[in-house]
């Protein structure tokens, strides 16, 4: 938790940052992600909360959100990451580096959606970050720094996952109702967070 507080100061770390870092790290020995696998995982994720219009309603704390999170966790573990849920309900995957005392490289995004949302906002950043880790594992390439993949919870409902890591949540914010009908407090507990330990996120 503490190490993330020092490294993450934005609401969501987008795919473009992941691609930029990846291109720099492997400029002299380029690795290639598996495009087919990436698209397959994006398609599979889009099934959770899929609506009749071709989009998705995977609002935070809903059953569809929980299923999508389980799917993402499965992919992260397959990619060789040590995965846990922080007290704020964010999914954290860690791929060890050669020197884990070095500051981590953090990438990721979110997978919750607005009601009647699209299939790519947030999803691309999250699934692409996992694909980066999978590519590193398959290539047997270990970074000097640890790599952290973060999937922030409830980004669409008010950036609550990233707020937990930066400024924290007030009692008033914890009682706000989300689009799924759960309060933020109940929602965080529903996805495996721990309200009493938020300061450790």
Predicted regions and their residues:
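A non-catalytic alpha/beta surface segment that caps or lines the substrate-entry region
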Residues: 50-96
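General beta-strand structural signal in soluble alpha/beta enzymes
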Residues: 83-87, 107-109, 149-151
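N-terminal hydrophobic or amphipathic helices/low-complexity stretches enriched
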Residues: 27-56, 96
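Catalytic-core environment of secreted peptidases
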Residues: 78-79, 91-124, 129
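Acidic/histidine-rich catalytic neighborhood of metal-dependent amide-processing enzymes
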Residues: 114, 123-201
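Hydrophobic h-region of N-terminal signal peptides that target proteins for export
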Residues: 19-27
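Sec-dependent signal peptide recognition
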Residues: 10-18
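N-terminal secretory signal peptides that target proteins for export/translocation
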Residues: 1-10
